[in-house]
Each structure stands twice: as C-alpha cells, then as structure tokens.
C-alpha cells in the first residue's frame, strides 16, 4: 500500500451492476464505483457443476472489477485491505474463490447500515435496484427494522425502465428530463409485460414525454403496491430513496406525489449497499482487533433450507457431456 492507513472495502454485486466503496480508517468515503455488468460470453464457461476457478464467469469478472477499482486507489492486492464485506444477490459460495471476503451480510442489513451512516436519524428506506425493490422501516416500539422485498415481477425494478427507454429510443440517463410531469397518461402497474404492451400500443400516438411519465408513474405505483404497505402506519415520514433507480428523479417525484412524504435521494444512493458493507467491514475489523470476535472460529458454510433442497432434487435435470461420464451443466427447471 502507498501508506500504512487501514482501508475497508464493501462490495455489492447485484443482478445488473457491480458496486464497491472504499472507506478510510477515519470513516471517510475515499472511492466508489457503480458499473453495469455484462453477460458471460457464450462458450467461455466450461464448469461441470463445480467451480474450477478459471475466472471466465461472473466471479472472475467481479474480481477483475474489484482489483481495477483498488488499483486506482493505489492498492495492488486484496491483502492490503483491513476487512472486506460483501452483499448482493449474486454473491454465492464460490465468490470466495475470487474475492477473499471476511464476511457476508444480507442486502437489507447493508442498505440500512449505509443509510444510517449518512443519515443517523433515518427510519424509512426504499431501495430499488435492477432485480427487486425493498422497503425498510424502523419500529421504535420493538426497536428493530422491518423489511419487505418485492416479488418476481420486473415492473417495480430498474430493468423495467431500461426496457421502456430502449423501446422508445431514449438513453436511460435522459428519461427524467424528458418526462412531462403534468401528464395524466397512465399505464398498468400490475405487470411489466402489460405496461410494455400499453406503451408499444400508444408510442406512435402519444408524445414521448407523456409515455415516459406514464412509465415512471407505473414504476412508482408498483414499488408502493409491492413493498409500500410498511409505510401505511407512518404517513408523512421522510423516506430515503436509494438504489440505481434513484438516478431517475422522475420516479422520486411520483413517489412523493403518491405518498405525500418527503422523498430524499441521499449522496451515494447508487452504492448504498456497498457503503453499508464497508461500514460493517470497519466495525468487524474493530471487533476483531479488540479480541471480541475471532472469525477463525466461525465456519463459513452457506446452507440452504430443507424445502429448497427437496425442490432442487425434485426438479434438477442433468445435461450430460458427450462421453456421458458427468453432467456438463446443472439446471433447475
């Protein structure tokens, strides 16, 4: 390292983006990165059910992105980081072969930690990413955070707006400035497919600003329909809106209009999960240094629930290689 100061790394690997935050010894954000990930090229991955560590998959790509991120900060190795904590939907047990993390935390834990780091008094959070939406609300009576995650529909996620922007030929970063905020155009907020069908039907008859307004309103309604019920008992409270979708201020505008609450888009909103992971990494290092926690005695072994194991056994299909000696890949169908 260029100096003896300790740094803490938080990494959040989601379905569409790679996020990382480097935190200094005194708790300041030194660097951040928010980068869209790319699908693995066909034919490059040849694993046979077990990770070979070749690095051709998403795990290898994440390692390369993380090392590039650290290199800009003058750090050449993961060994120069005091503690690494990871989170995100794409973190799997084989991720450790590529990124030697010390601890893994849930997305909810990471997002709350990041939000409280910047806004200590926060008690309501909406996070909207590429794959799902989450709502987290603090219950002062029970002194704990309650959370809710959206279902499988893409309508309340960043992927929906990506597809709408592509369909209309608009760059996703230009959507907010092209929205007609006075438009009364409405689209279905029940299903992403129905919304896309409606947009396709009207795109040659309705101004693009109205179409984008309808899409952003549909997105805001879907977020609230899927996870917003946690906010029903506390109308008018300040809500932190974070995640990649918060780049689109139009969605925040319609969330405010629908809820009547103050919607705050915090600094580092796009990397809040990674920021929370970095904050936890700093806390983890302090506990380890003080002797209150010995990670060497904690066995890291992700386990799946019994019901999930039974379902996988019941639905697995083996696709055999040409010599029939072992599966080429395993699929859950």
Task: Outline where the language-model segments fall.
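Acidic, glycine/GT-rich loop-and beta-edge segments that sit at the periphery of enzyme/chaperone cores
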Residues: 283-333
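Gly/Thr-rich phosphate-binding beta-strand-loop-beta motif of the actin/hexokinase/Hsp70
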Residues: 2-26, 122-141, 333
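Adenine-nucleotide phosphate-binding core of ATP-dependent small-molecule kinases
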Residues: 195-229
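Short glycine-rich, Thr/Ser-proximal phosphate-binding strand/loop in the N-terminal lobe
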Residues: 8-60, 144-147, 151
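Short beta-strand-loop/turn "lid" adjacent to the catalytic site in phosphate-handling enzymes
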Residues: 37, 50-56, 73-108, 145-146
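Glycine-rich phosphate-binding loops at beta-strand->alpha-helix junctions
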Residues: 88-91, 218, 231-258, 269-273
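Conserved phosphate-binding/catalytic loops in two-lobed NTP-binding clefts
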Residues: 101-108, 256-275
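A short helix-loop
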Residues: 137-142, 150-151, 158-193, 288-305
């Amino acid at each position: 390292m260029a100096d003896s100061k300790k740094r803490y790394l938080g990494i959040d690997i989601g379905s569409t983006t790679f996020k990382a935050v480097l935190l200094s010894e005194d708790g300041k954000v030194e660097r951040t990165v928010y980068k869209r990930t790319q699908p693995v090229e066909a034919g490059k991955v040849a694993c046979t059910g077990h990770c070979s560590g070749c690095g051709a998959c998403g795990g290898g790509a994440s390692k390369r992105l993380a090392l590039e991120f650290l290199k800009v900060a003058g750090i050449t190795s993961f060994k120069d980081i005091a503690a690494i904590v990871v989170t995100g939907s794409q973190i799997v047990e084989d991720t450790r072969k590529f990124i030697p993390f010390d601890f893994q935390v849930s997305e909810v834990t990471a997002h709350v930690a990041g939000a409280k780091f910047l806004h200590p008094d926060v008690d309501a959070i909406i996070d909207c990413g590429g794959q799902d939406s989450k709502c987290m609300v603090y219950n002062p009576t029970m002194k704990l955070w309650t959370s809710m995650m959206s279902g499988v529909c893409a309508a309340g996620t960043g992927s929906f707006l990506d597809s709408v922007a592509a369909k209309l030929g608009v760059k996703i970063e230009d959507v907010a400035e092209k929205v007609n905020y006075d438009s009364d155009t409405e689209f279905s907020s029940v299903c992403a497919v129905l919304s896309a069908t409606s947009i396709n039907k009207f795109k040659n008859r309705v101004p693009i600003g109205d179409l984008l307004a309808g899409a952003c309103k549909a997105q805001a309604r879907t977020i609230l329909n899927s996870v917003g019920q946690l906010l029903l008992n506390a109308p008018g409270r300040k809500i932190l809106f974070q995640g990649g979708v918060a780049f689109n201020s139009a969605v925040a505008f319609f969330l405010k209009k629908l809820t009547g609450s103050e919607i705050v888009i915090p600094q580092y909103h796009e990397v809040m999960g990674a920021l929370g992971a970095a904050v936890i990494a700093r806390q983890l290092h302090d506990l380890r240094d003080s002797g209150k926690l010995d990670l060497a005695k904690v066995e890291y072994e992700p386990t799946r629930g019994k019901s999930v194991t039974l379902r996988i056994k019941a639905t697995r299909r083996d696709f055999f290689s040409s010599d029939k000696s072992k599966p080429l890949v395993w699929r859950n169908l």
